[in-house]
Amino acid sequence: MLTTFLLGLTFFTRIPVPGKLNFSEEKFNRAPIFLPAYGLVTGGILALIIELFGRSFPGFFWAGVIIAGQIYLSGALHIDGLLDSLDAIYSNRDREKRLEILKDSRVGSMAVAFFGAFLILKYGSYASFTPKVQAFTVLISEIILRGTGYLVIYSFPYVGSSLGRGFKDNASTAGLIFTLGQTLIFTLGAAAFFNFSLIKILIILLLAYLFAFVVAARWQQFFGGLTGDNYGGIMELTGLFVPVAVLLINNIGVV
């Protein structure tokens, strides 16, 4: 299990692992069961930085740090999937052509435009928070977006033969329960630590999982299934949904 965790950590994040790992495809393909734990690590790093130095700089500065930190710690892995997915979806081509576009390394104008709007909305959400709320939100966002990733892998058919095929073939009901448990424990723990309403965090968690499922179901219609790029894209969109949800739920005074 430790080897599986570390192999996944080197793939899903840029966090260095000491020593040399003996690669095992079988163990690597099981790594998504630790997706929420990887989110705890990356989100924890960013939250700790903000907690330690949050009072030294204004909130709009930390909003930029959060976005840059998320991109760096993930190696832009999910962003690449988001851009490829948007290019394919908004190409208005048939299913086979869309799948070809997913494999194209070039980025189209639609993807660039949508990604610009994505960054503005994400930045605006985080910039609206105090440093303490920023630290809390980036922590739960990193956990939840990866937790929903396993839900999507498990719930929808895979199309193609790229890297994500191994993740899909090894997804199981036990793995789904395990990742749900991690996500629930980690987010509730974060809420308790930051003195955030447990009811609110449960609402956000439920809405985020529902959001990821609905997006995945819609994208499945475009591609006849999902690919590894789609997995990353859906996780990125969920990573935007969470801070927006925190902002809206706090402002409208839900519970």
UniProtKB/Swiss-Prot annotation:
Its main location: membrane. It catalyses: alpha-ribazole + adenosylcob(III)inamide-GDP = adenosylcob(III)alamin + GMP + H(+); alpha-ribazole 5'-phosphate + adenosylcob(III)inamide-GDP = adenosylcob(III)alamin 5'-phosphate + GMP + H(+). It holds the Pfam family CobS. The keyword Aminoacyl-tRNA synthetase does not apply. One of its GO terms (biological process) is cobalamin biosynthetic process. Keywords: Cell membrane, Cobalamin biosynthesis, Magnesium, Membrane, Transferase, Transmembrane, Transmembrane helix. The keyword NAD does not apply. It comes from the Bacteria. It is found in: Cell membrane. InterPro entries: CobS. It is a multi-pass membrane protein. One of its GO terms (cellular component) is plasma membrane. Joins adenosylcobinamide-GDP and alpha-ribazole to generate adenosylcobalamin (Ado-cobalamin). Also synthesizes adenosylcobalamin 5'-phosphate from adenosylcobinamide-GDP and alpha-ribazole 5'-phosphate. Belongs to the CobS family. This is Adenosylcobinamide-GDP ribazoletransferase. It comes from Carboxydothermus hydrogenoformans (strain ATCC BAA-161 / DSM 6008 / Z-2901). The gene is cobS.
